[in-house]
Amino acid sequence: MEKSYDCFAEYGLHGTGIRALAKHCGCTSNMLYTYFENLDDLIIQSTEYCMTKVEDDFMAKAPTDVEDLWRFIDEIPYWTAKKHGKKYRLMYQVYTHPKYREYGQKFFKGVDERYTEYAKSLEGKLGIPYEKITPLIFILIRACVHYALFEDEFYLKSQIEVLKETLELFVMKYNPKFKEATK
């Protein structure tokens, strides 16, 4: 699945047929049809699989302690753009296509749930309610993906600046002891 997704990411969704995919994967077209009902099934399954791996890569870098939070916010947009930019572009191409939109909605519902769980894990460490942390995670993710798609430095920096300032305000409101400890 990963090889087929990489092939789509490299050559485009519409310019890549089953023969090109098979060649890229080192197999025959018939072999692909052994695993997938049709090209749409291959696109749907490989997109979900690869974007889950991208999310896992991203979360593996996510901070587990407060001291690492600011570094993570500064570095992750550039890292993920370099490592996953083509995959994000293809994901948006697939999940915004009318034929596959429902699969995108399903995937992002799962993303919402996973990031909410991550926010809950940060709640005790930051002292900020997870209901406040969750939207900040979404802002960071959106800024990262937008940067990976368009390399729009202005958009990225303005989002990151607001994110950091909001985090500082929440820390002062909910956990002033942490703010003093990091000075």
Put a short name on every predicted segment.
Residues 3, 7-41, 45:
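Helix-turn-helix
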Residues 55, 99-127, 131-135, 161:
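Amphipathic alpha-helical packing segments from all-alpha helical-bundle domains
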Residues 75-117, 150:
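Short secondary-structure transition hinges
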Residues 128-150, 158-169:
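Hydrophobic alpha-helical segments that form the core
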Residues 174-183:
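C-terminal effector-binding regulatory domain of bacterial HTH transcription factors
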